[in-house]
C-alpha cells in the first residue's frame, strides 16, 4: 500500500493493517469557506484574476499581431478573453472571434459557460463546432469555440480564414499535431492578412520560445498607413492565478498498482480529511471504469468509509448528460470524486476540488518510423503536467495533492516538459492535411517543433501506396482530394461501439473479426428501431450508437457532395474485409508457425504482437490478420482485428507489398 509523507518532515510511523494500510501525514487544514458565496455572474467575472488585465489584453491585441497570454488554470483566460474582445468591437460588422481547444469536451463545456455568462443560448451568439457536430449559426454566432482540427478543415474552404478577426489558440502547451499545424499555418496567414490578430494562450507554455517562433525574420515593406498596422513582434502577458497553497505528499516506495493505490487513497481522504471534492488522474477509460467500479462496490459494502461519495468518470467519450453531472454543484453533505484522464489538467475547470490524487501517468502515442508501428502506451507525465495536476487542488481554498510516486523520482527522473505529439506520432493524416491545404514542401514547413524526416518520408510512402499521392507527391484526383475532405483519420474505418462487452460479443460475434461484429451490432440496432431498451438488454452503449448514426449520416452527405457512389455490400462480408485491407494494409500480421502463445509478427518490421483479449478473434488466431491500433502493456496487443486473405495485400497496395517479397511469406 502507498505510504504518504510530506517532504521536510520526519518519516511517519506505519499504520496497523486494521487502520487501512495507507498512511497519511496529519497536517493543519483550514476548512473555512472561500468567502466567495453567491454572486451575480458579472461579479463572478470581475473576481477572476484575468479581469484586472482586461485593459492590457485589449491594448496588446490592438497593437500587436500576436499576443501570448500565459495564465494559470482557473485564471479565467479561456472564458473571459473572447468576451473582452467582443465587448471591444472585434466581432462587429459580421466578424467572428474564434477560440480553439485541443479537446471536444472542453469546446462544449467552455461554450456552455460563456453562453451562460452572456445570457444567450448556445448556438446563437455563442456557438461551437466539433467533429460531426456544428452548434453555431453563420448569421448570428460572433464567438465560436472549436477544436484545432475543425479550424484546419475550415481552411480547406477558406484558406485565409477571412471571417475571423481574432483567433485564440488556447491550451497551446498541449502541443497536439493539430495545434502545431495550426500555429504554422496561422503564421503564414498573418503575412497575407496583417489585420488578423492571434492570441496564443496557455498555462505552462515557454513564452519566449513561442515568441521566437512568431517573430518575423523579414522586415515588412513600409507602405501608406503603416503606422496603423500592428507590430510584428509578439507581446507576452503573464496572468496571475488565484491559487491557494497546496501541500504535496509523496509515496515512500513505488506503487505496484496505481489504480488500486488511487482507490485506497480516495477512501482514506474521505475517511480522514475535511469536506472537499476529490480529483483523481488516471490514464484512460479502461482504468477509470475499473476505479469507478471498485469505489462503487466499496460504497455499497462499507458505509463507514464511503457513505456520501458521488463517483463520476470524466473522459472524452461521455454523453452530454454524463458531462453535466461532473460540472454540477456537489449536494450538501456529499463529496464528489471525479476520476479523469489528463483532460482535467488544464482544459476544464472543476469547482470544489480540494484534493488531487495523481497517478503520475497518462496515455500517449509513440510511433517508430523504422518498424512502422504506433503504440498507445501508458507513459510517465512531465513535471509541467504534475504541477498542473497539483494546482487543481488549490483553486478555492488550501488543498492537498497526493502523488503516487516518490519525491526523488519527481526531482531527479521526471522530464521537465512533454514531447510534442508531432515528434512521436504517425504523420500520415498530418501530411495529407498539409497537401490538401496546398503545402507541397512539407519538409520545409515552418513547424514550432520539427518532426523527424524519417516519419515524414514514411508518411509519403504510405500515401503513395494508397493512391492518394502521385509520382510528384501531389494529391491525386479525385481520390486524394476526397480522402482529405473526409473528417476521419485516413486509417479509420468506424468502430461502431466503444464498449466491447463480453455479452454483446456472444450475441453478435462474427468469425471474420471485430469489424464485422461491429457491423452486426449496428444492423441489430437498426432492426430494433434504434431502441435504448435493446441496447440495455445487449450491454451496448446507446449514446455511442446514436453518435454512430449521426456520423454515418454526415459521412454519407460528404460522400454524395464529393461524387462518391455509395453501394451496399449486402451480405457479402468479404467486401468489408477487403475494404479494411485497402485502408489498413500497412497493419498486416502473420501468425508465427508453431506458436502456442498466439504470437503474430508484423509484415513490415517483424514486430511481435498479440490479439487483444477484447477481440472476438482472441484465441481463434487466424493465420493472417489486420489490426486498427496497438496498445502496449506487458506485450503489444492488436485492437479491432479482422482476418484476411494475404493475396488481398498485393491487390490493395502493390507499391507497398511487392509480389516477389510477399510470395515467400504467404507460402
Cite the ranges covered by each PLM segment.
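P-loop NTPase motor module signature
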Residues: 1-486, 537, 543-552, 556-582, ...
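Short, surface-exposed, low-complexity cationic segments
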Residues: 614-635
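Extended, well-ordered protein cores
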Residues: 16-17, 640-642
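Mobile, glycine-enriched helix-loop/loop "lid" segments at the mouths of ligand-binding/catalytic clefts
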Residues: 364-365, 514-515, 522
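Leucine-rich, amphipathic alpha-helical/linker segments
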Residues: 487-503, 507-518
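Short, charged, solvent-exposed linker or helix-capping segments at domain edges/interfaces
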Residues: 258, 637-638
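N-terminal leader/propeptide and maturation segments of large enzyme subunits in energy/redox metabolism
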Residues: 524-543
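Terminal-proximal interaction/regulatory segments of ATP-powered molecular machines
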Residues: 601-604, 609-610
